[in-house]
């Protein structure tokens, strides 16, 4: 092959059985350093863990609000009952209207 093929980063040779050989270019060898690569991994891991902690915090806040909504709606009934009766206002009005209709029919 020619000199231009080896400077481009790959060279192929069909005669000796290899089709594609990769050679590092000058740009990739200057950028690829082990300490720089390791610091990039630390940055990505720290960003991931920060986002994970933030999402966990949002989930906890949402669950607390949901728990407060559920507990406030179940602990305070709209119409407190007298003498242990479990009738709602609608049921009481319905019963009283049926009684008045029955008394009008009977008289």
UniProtKB/Swiss-Prot annotation:
A family per Pfam: SRTM1
Q: Does the keyword Transmembrane apply?
A: yes
What are its GO cellular component terms? intracellular membrane-bounded organelle; membrane
Asked if rRNA-binding is a keyword of the record, the answer is no
Q: Which organism is it from?
A: Mus musculus (Mouse)
Instruction: Extract the coiled-coil ranges from the record.
Output: none
Q: Which InterPro entries match?
A: SERTM
Annotated keywords: Membrane, Transmembrane, Transmembrane helix
**Localization of this protein:** Membrane
Q: Which superkingdom does the taxonomy of this entry point to?
A: Eukaryota
Instruction: Give me the segments passing through the membrane.
Output: 43-63
What's this protein's name? Serine-rich and transmembrane domain-containing protein 1
Regarding the membrane, this protein is recorded as: Single-pass membrane protein
Specify where it is mainly localized.
membrane
């Amino acid at each position: 092959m020619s000199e231009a093929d080896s400077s481009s980063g790959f060279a192929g040779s069909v005669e000796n059985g290899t089709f594609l050989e990769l050679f590092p270019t000058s740009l990739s060898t200057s950028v690829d350093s082990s300490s720089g690569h390791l610091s990039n991994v630390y940055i990505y891991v720290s960003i991931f863990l920060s986002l994970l902690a933030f999402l966990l915090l949002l989930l906890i806040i949402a669950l607390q609000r949901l728990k407060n909504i559920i507990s406030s709606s179940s602990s305070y009934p709209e119409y407190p009952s007298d003498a242990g009766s479990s009738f709602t206002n609608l049921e009481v009005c319905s019963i009283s209207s049926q009684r008045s209709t029955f008394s009008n029919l009977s008289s």
